[in-house]
Regions:
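Active/binding-pocket-proximal capping segment
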Residues: 226-231, 296-297, 307-312
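Hydrophobic beta-strand signal
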Residues: 64, 291-292
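Charged low-complexity "KEKE/polyampholyte" interaction tracts
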Residues: 2-48, 56, 67-83, 92-93, ...
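Conserved AWS/pre-SET-to-SET junction and N-terminal core of the SET lysine methyltransferase domain
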Residues: 2-83, 174-199, 203-281, 286
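C-terminal globular interaction/adhesion domains in large, modular proteins
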Residues: 111-185, 189-196, 208
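Eukaryote-specific, cytoplasm-facing alpha-helical/coiled-coil scaffolding segments in long proteins
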Residues: 57, 88-94, 124-144, 212, ...
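Short conserved micro-motifs at the rims of enzyme active sites and ligand-binding pockets
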Residues: 218, 222-225, 291, 303-305, ...
Length: 503
């Protein structure tokens, strides 16, 4: 811990030396780039290491300025290394993200000789992005779409690694820096930590700027959306090209309209300042964690690109299997607009499509179509059918999943116990473990490790990493199931109210 503190001080001093500062006073001399507005702090329940306000901050106030020469980009790395520059120029077929990944590994291979060493030593050793999930953690997601996204992310990473292999060999990287595990690390670093820059789609690594933890878009930027209101959709970008903007796409009454976007006060690269400028996105009190918004993401997208998820995420969406004939009726809305909000309310597009789908084809005249596209109820009986169908569909999806909400809650509780080295498990507790917990212990050969000697439990690092990813899988699927359960409750309540009007 003391060594970590010392290396952090070294990094902050190095950052100050190259012009990074949390003060607008350019003449201010300091042995740290922080201290005027921000300081490094630990937030165990809110993202871990982050930045806290050391004074009151006002919305829109500049809180960190990182000059262009301090940004870690492909441009800045090849400019100071002829060997790297010559090798990169011979591989124009590689994507900008692949090139940046190779450059990052090349700098890592230099060790203390790298100009970026004070920054590189503070990068995480491990990440929890979906591409890093093993077979056990992947299957623990349970939901077919989530498993597919994970497999796709892993396959993409493997393909990009193989394509970049020749360049890494030409740079004479040591075998450990050419390995797939090293590539996974570099790819995850770039996916989760880069910020948008206008001259390179791969983005940049921003020393000190990547200490901020994530904040979801505020309520002031979200539209309240239920079956009778406008629909909000979002199209997440890969993390490496996210530019700290949150975009809200609004479709009025099911019609495709021009995208409405609002730039947040978080910041971006400013040409006139020749620096990355980051701003307070709201007012902060002394001691509060200062956060940045990367964009609008579902929890699965956050896991894919960043390696974490949010318990409360107003941008989360749950997709359920729908009949092919239903999709054919939804031509006025994108398929990704047919979803359930995290609070359990079906989206405008999903409800509107169901209203039309549940009307006999012979009765789908112009008057019905006008009501559908206006977002209006066709009839009380039709609305009851819609709510009944949604409730039964969600119930069917829940029943077909391997575990229930209560079982997942218990499993999360047991995982937390395993992760706490101070908690000694009693024999009767381990005997009550469910099949998934037992499978995890079997795979990792941990039955002896969690013995009953009364000593603190210490798992191997690899096991702890696997457990963290497994916990995220269970946490994600639990959120998915809760949304379905909330949708059942919402639909049943609405159905009962509608039935009351018929009496």
């Amino acid at each position: 811990m003391e060594l970590e503190h010392q290396t952090m001080e070294t990094f902050l001093r190095w950052a100050a030396d190259i012009g990074i500062s949390d003060s607008i006073d350019s003449s201010r001399c300091s042995d740290s780039c922080l201290g005027h507005s921000l300081s490094v702090a630990d937030f165990p329940l809110a993202g871990g290491r982050g930045l806290r306000a050391v004074r009151e901050l006002r919305k829109g106030e500049l809180v960190l300025k990182v000059p262009r020469n301090a940004l870690m980009t492909t441009e800045s790395m090849v400019a100071n290394d002829q060997k790297l520059n010559d090798a990169v120029n011979l591989h124009g077929s590689l994507s900008s993200t692949q090139i940046l990944s190779v450059c990052l590994l090349y700098e890592m291979s230099k060790g203390k000789k790298s100009f970026w060493y004070p920054y590189l030593v503070h990068l995480p050793r491990d990440y929890d992005l979906l591409a890093t999930f093993g077979e056990f953690e992947k299957q623990a997601l349970q939901v077919e779409d989530a498993v597919w996204v994970t497999e796709k992310a892993t396959a993409k990473c493997q393909s990009e690694w193989k394509e970049a292999g020749t360049l890494m060999k030409e740079l004479d990287l040591k075998p450990k820096f050419q390995s797939f595990q090293a590539w996974l690390w570099a790819s995850a670093t770039i996916s989760s930590r880069t910020l948008h820059i206008p001259w390179d789609s791969a983005g940049c690594l921003c020393p000190a700027g990547d200490l901020f933890n994530y904040d979801a878009p505020g309520d002031d930027l979200n539209y309240s959306e239920g079956p009778e209101s406008a629909i909000q959709t979002s199209s997440p970008q890969p993390a490496s090209i996210t530019n700290l903007e949150c975009r809200n796409n609004e479709e009025e009454a099911g019609l495709n309209v021009e995208i409405q976007s609002e730039r947040l006060t978080d910041g971006g690269f400013e040409e006139d300042a020749n620096a990355y400028c980051l701003y307070a996105r709201r007012n902060y009190q002394l001691g509060e964690q200062v956060l940045l918004c990367y964009g609008t993401y579902t929890n699965l997208e956050l896991l894919e690109h960043y390696g974490f998820m949010l318990e409360e995420n107003s941008n989360d969406k749950v997709f359920i299997p729908l009949e092919t004939s239903l999709y054919s009726l939804a031509s006025s809305w994108p398929k990704d607009s047919l979803y359930i909000h995290q609070d359990g309310k079906p989206s405008f597009a999903l409800v509107s499509t169901l209203r039309l789908w549940l009307v006999p084809q012979s009765q789908r005249d112009k008057s019905v179509m006008r009501l559908v596209y206006a977002g209006s109820q066709i009839s009380v009986k039709n609305e009851i059918l819609v709510m009944k169908w949604m409730s039964e569909k969600c119930g069917s999806v829940l029943r077909n999943l391997p575990t229930s909400v209560s079982e997942d809650n218990l499993l999360l509780h047991n995982i937390d116990k395993l992760q706490d080295p101070k908690i000694r498990l009693e024999q009767k507790e381990t005997e009550a473990f469910g099949s998934e917990m037992r499978a995890f212990l079997d795979v990792n050969r941990l039955w002896d490790v969690i013995g009953f000697s009364g000593k603190d439990v210490e798992f191997p690092r690899r096991t702890n990493r696997m457990m963290s990813k497994w916990r995220l899988s269970v946490q994600w699927r639990l959120s998915y199931k809760r949304t379905l359960a909330d949708c059942i409750y919402y639909c049943n309540e609405k159905m009962n109210n509608l039935l009351g009007t018929l009496r």
